[in-house]
Amino acid sequence: MAKSTRMTFCSFCGKAQNEVRKMIAGPAGVHICDSCVSVCKTIIDRELSGSEEGEARRSAEGGKKGRFNLLRPAEIKARLDEHVISQDYAKRTLAVAVYNHYKRLRDGLHTDSKADLSRMDSDFRDVEIEKSNILLLGPTGSGKTLLASTLAKMLDVPFAIADATTLTEAGYVGEDVENIVLRLLQAAEYDVKRAECGIIYVDEIDKIGRKTDNVSITRDVSGEGVQQALLKILEGTVCNVPPQGGRKHPNQEYIQLNTSNILFICGGAFVDLDKIVQSRVGSKVMGFDTLHDRRHSEVPVSELLRETQPEDLVRYGMIPEFIGRLPMVAVLDELSRSDLEHILQNTKNSLVKQYGKLFSMEGVKLHFTRDALAAIAEKAIELKTGARALRSIMERIMLDIMYDLPDSETAEEVVINRAVVDGRGKPKIKHGEKRTAKPGKSPQAQASESSEDAA
């Protein structure tokens, strides 16, 4: 009779024996995996070495304006302009909000210079500035995530992205809200003090709106329940974060992290919110015209969204307490064809520049005609996914030429025109003299190949 083998599981993280490299057995059927042992060692080492050395390091870091680069609003907007086309209203709003947030942190860390203190009125020195989280409203592909990530890079602070649709209320299948904070802690390489000055971007926040206004016996664990769970984290609380993530359980080791100084940026498309605003505004005068007199199709969605009030978001499904913790609202415009053309070629890491670099590695120049760029932008508008559509369109256009190019030894320049974008033609290749060096191979390797061919 075959001997049955019983699968063992880690008593800490719950992983099976075949999912880890080593499982260590303890008394009374308790087991621990090598990954959890490593985490425990890290926690113990941090606590043991966190006395004198840790205090010295933290005080040294505290002298550097609170461990982040504090830029003026104009500088922040100028940096954002390098990466994000258009969206001036949103960039100005973000620049002011971020500047005030990190100035608040610097004040809280008591690292202001003597010049700053001398300018400050004595009546305000004991005033505590409250945190202002940010809500981004805008269509998909308009640059919400890019704005948030660019802010984190320029400020040199940890940054994490979370998807609100994966979150559920504690005790139900799905991710706990503490896992959002865990991602930030991981981005900070488990440096708690650094993580406490970071930025968290919560995407698809509109998807956790209350499903219905009707009272139901069924609990809304992924909608209103998640909003309730996020309240304390947004406002500021000390979270007990499990180092390995997952669900909490008794006797588990936690890392404590204060969210009071973490900047939360929540973003969502909020589809049809403009209709709610339209119904509320009615005949309210805007300039020399009224929304009542103009057909809805003639009013830009972004213009309506700028009139958004908390009551509109409540009607959309967000609870009042949640909205109150996102006082700063920035609206992003839907990208036009000219915006998409600028994104293709004029941003710091534009797709045209990225593909140009790939081609230059092969010793070949890449050129897009103006009508080709216009055609790509038109196709992106048809797909209705904003700037996200640009890469998929470019990948399709460039697939064949990038497949054949490495085998060509005489190609000097590749020209992409509208016919290529529309699928009615092939890229034009200008040939020259045979290249002496093949990209990707060293001169020694090529010399060896040549000698073998001669032999």
Regions found by a protein language model. Give the residues of each.
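The −1 position to Zn-ligating cysteines in a subset of zinc-ribbon hairpins
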Residues: F9, G29-I32
